[in-house]
Amino acid sequence: MERGHEFEPEARDLYTFQTGAHLERVGFIRNGRVGCSPDSLIGEDGGLEIKTKLPHLLIELILKDEFPPEHKAQVQGTLWVTKRQWWDIGIYWPGVPLFVKRAYRDEAYIQRVATEVDRFNGELDEVVAQIRRRSEAVAA
């Protein structure tokens, strides 16, 4: 995690240089009861998530030239929360080419995530209500 934060500015600058995109850094974005903290927004429709991988893993990824499946949930969740249409993942290690792959909204996947998040929030609401009832009973 520290490594990622250390290299993030360098990766962001390299992405900007390669793509010409204007990156808007933002904090936590809320959409109802869900939220995310993307690395950058791009224009009206896109965004960027920056990751680091050790050189041997990054080279493997470059050779496969596929969106890394271990980041699908995060990126699709971010697309859901931000209501954006596409999201780039930039994976970096100094001295290795920046790997960039774009993901587009997968509506079926997003719907499954939304259903599970709604289910979880319902369970959470019930737990909170039970705790409140118990604390009110103790206070009475």
Where are each of the predicted segments found?
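Accessory terminal regions of nucleic-acid processing enzymes
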Residues: 1-140
